[in-house]
Regions:
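Glycine-rich phosphate-binding loop signature in dinucleotide/nucleotide-binding domains
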Residues: 60-64, 115, 160-164, 210-212
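Surface "functional belts" at beta-alpha junctions
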Residues: 20-34, 38, 44, 99-197, ...
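N-terminal beta-alpha supersecondary unit
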Residues: 1-74
Length: 251
């Protein structure tokens, strides 16, 4: 049994999942959702996340240390949300001696799309840009067609014009559907729903390492795609000499 969470949007998705298949490495299969918890605004993830995790485990009589591991959506998405989710997973895993695993939040959304057509999964980025992940879904697996990126709505529309079979889905369509249609994307190619990455679908993508590794735990980073605001506009100029080997993620 393991716990999966995604905080890449303002909506927290948290799932307690157990394995049913004899072969745990079976792609996306053999999993049963014990409970899926969804908590949206106005509640703040930084304030509620530890309590929601504790309450979920308590409802099913499961202790944190009894879990196989903890899994988290790595984005791209909200910089603050990603930091909250990953910090929570790292601290809980370190305290309880658990394995950790992560997967793309956009790929989890692609698992909810139709099969055998290019899927452009869209999430809101900063500066009126959109994160775009291009995938092909086959059953319980997804294939990335190219690296995830960020671009303007107009550029997304141009990409869809160049790939007439592609359809778009994802949380960005809540706010940017009209903008994409104004740039020529037909309404039927913008799929409804899919307002946040589901921890249930994310659970089908994660693969835990065979052994727990502190190095892997501390090395896990969110997939920001683009630099966060503090990295683009540092408060202080860089010091002379070689660049530091570690980057600060704090605002």
């Amino acid at each position: 049994m393991f716990l999966t969470l995604d905080t890449s949007t303002l909506t927290l998705s948290l799932a307690l999942v157990e394995r049913e298949a004899a072969e745990p490495s079976e792609p996306g299969g053999g999993l049963r959702t014990v409970e899926h918890v969804v908590v949206g605004p106005p509640q703040k993830q930084s304030e509620i996340l530890p309590g929601v995790v504790g309450e979920l485990l308590a409802r099913h009589g499961v202790k944190l240390a009894e879990l196989e591991g903890l899994a988290v959506g790595l984005g791209p998405g909200s910089f603050t949300g990603l930091r909250i989710g990953l910090a929570t997973v790292k601290s809980l895993a370190y305290a309880a001696g658990l394995k950790v695993a992560g997967a793309s939040s956009l790929a989890a959304l692609a698992l909810e799309g139709p099969e055998d057509v290019p899927l452009y999964v869209l999430a809101v980025a900063r500066k009126d840009d959109l994160y775009l992940g291009a995938y092909l879904r086959r059953g319980g697996t997804v294939e990335a067609l190219e690296p995830e990126t960020a671009m303007s709505p107009q550029e997304v529309a141009a990409r869809m014009a160049a790939e007439p079979r592609a359809v778009a889905l994802g949380p960005a369509l809540v706010d940017y559907r009209a903008a994409l249609e104004s740039h020529g994307v037909a309404a039927h190619r913008l799929l409804p729903g899919h307002a946040f990455p589901s921890a249930v679908e994310l659970s089908r993508l994660v693969r835990f390492p065979e052994e727990r590794s502190l190095q892997a735990l501390f090395a896990m980073e969110p997939h920001y795609v683009r630099a966060s605001e503090p990295e683009r506009n540092p408060k202080f100029p860089p010091l002379p000499g070689p660049a530091p080997s570690a980057r600060l993620k704090e605002d």
